[in-house]
From Swiss-Prot:
This is NADH-quinone oxidoreductase subunit 9. The gene is nqo9. GO terms for biological process: aerobic respiration. Its cofactor is [4Fe-4S] cluster. NDH-1 shuttles electrons from NADH, via FMN and iron-sulfur (Fe-S) centers, to quinones in the respiratory chain. The immediate electron acceptor for the enzyme in this species is menaquinone. Couples the redox reaction to proton translocation (for every two electrons transferred, four hydrogen ions are translocated across the cytoplasmic membrane), and thus conserves the redox energy in a proton gradient required for the synthesis of ATP. It is found in: Cell membrane. It comes from Thermus thermophilus (strain ATCC 27634 / DSM 579 / HB8). The keyword DNA damage does not apply.
Length: 182
């Protein structure tokens, strides 16, 4: 190695030694997500509180990873669950199989399923990574592990991201502010 090459390599090292780090201190500082980020699935509702999902199973048919299971049922006219003739009695998404491509969102004729902003879904049990309808409704804050940790500690659900723009499809979804709180 020549003296010139040694000086160049030391110069590069010194340049990066005193520059701003590229890495983000993720757990301590919230991460700014982009508007088209694909995260945890959210099942939306109409303004009157009825579910938008009509149990048509088009999202399951569009899913290339076969991660979605929908079991439709007839809607009771006296006590409707959704605005259509049917509703999703069982709606499950296996988050281990899901590739977060967004094809389910595109296939949905009512705009019921939207890919939200939650991405912290690591868990220990396989069964905890199969999200049911009650885990994905729009008024549910955080993922299963986040809710379990909040229940254990008695603190509110803490999310590690900041969304500068909230998609209009996520009606009722409270995006966190700059401090990382909703």
């Amino acid at each position: 190695m020549t003296l010139k090459a040694l000086a160049q390599s030391l110069g590069i090292t010194l340049k990066y030694l005193f520059s701003k780090p590229v890495t983000v201190p993720y757990p301590d500082a919230p991460v700014a997500l982009k508007p088209r980020f694909h995260g945890r699935h959210v099942l939306t509702r109409h303004p009157n509180g009825l579910e938008k999902c009509i149990g048509c199973s088009l999202c399951a048919a569009a899913c290339p990873a076969y991660a979605i299971y929908v079991e439709p049922a007839e809607n009771d006219p006296e006590n409707p669950v959704s605005a259509g003739e049917r509703y999703a009695k069982v709606y499950e998404i296996n988050m281990l199989r899901c590739i977060f491509c967004g094809l389910c969102e595109e296939a949905c004729p009512t705009g019921a399923i939207v890919l939200g902003y939650d991405f912290e879904m690591a868990d220990y049990e396989y069964s905890d990574l199969v999200y049911g309808k009650e885990d994905m409704l729009v008024d549910v804050v955080g993922t299963k592990p986040q809710r379990r940790e909040a229940k254990r500690t008695g603190k509110p659900v803490k999310v590690g991201y900041v969304v500068p723009y909230v998609r209009p499809e996520l009606e009722g979804f409270k995006a966190p502010t700059e401090g990382g709180k909703r």
